[in-house]
Amino acid sequence: MSTIKVLNMAGAEVGTVELNDAIFGIEPNQAVVHEVVKNHLANCRQGTQSALTRGEVSGGGKKPWRQKGTGHAREGSTRAPQWTHGGIVFAPKPRSYSYVLNKKVKRLALKSALSAKAAAGEIIVVDSIKMDSIKTKDFRAFLTAVKADGKSLVVTPAKDEVIVKSARNIPGVETSMANLINVYDILKAKYLVLDQNALAVIEEVFA
């Protein structure tokens, strides 16, 4: 097991903690990570795009000119796709882009992402992430103290409205509960800032 430092919210080292190799020490599987990120983005799509085919556009019932003798190409409708205001060929219609992945695949991708972060030294463990009041300035100071400036994912063991509201106005900073972390958010962040209790939850849920 690898050992990393545990900091307090002031950035001072207060101890160490061992990371479970079954979660933070595997060889990352990039193909699986790619598939899970693709699945996440597909599931986020609204799927509301819609356009009209030539049969659905209003008008165009009359033949614009006679078949022969005009010098024009033959035309049967002003709503054919090559015309301005004509219908769309294979027009998109509202549909769901979501699809299901095997749970084992998702779990492997999550472990791969966490292992990659651990190998890169981009996991920061804090003994307790707690704030008395909603204060964005204080939360930004905390991130600076633990050297997690920039894109960061702050993970707490349970939902903490004070932390969520303190962090939500800082560009690039996201928050999550330990049991709800996903591969996309982990990879999008430069640093993974874990409450020590959140680390215990992750190891309990995903080991």
Question: Positions of the model-derived regions?
Answer:
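A short, flexible low-complexity segment enriched in Lys/Arg and Gly/Pro that occurs
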Residues: 31-68
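Exposed boundary/loop context
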Residues: 4, 8, 18, 40, ...
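Glycine/serine-rich anion-binding loops at beta->alpha junctions
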Residues: 54-90
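Extended polybasic, low-complexity segments that bind anionic RNA or targeting/receptor surfaces
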Residues: 1-46, 91-207
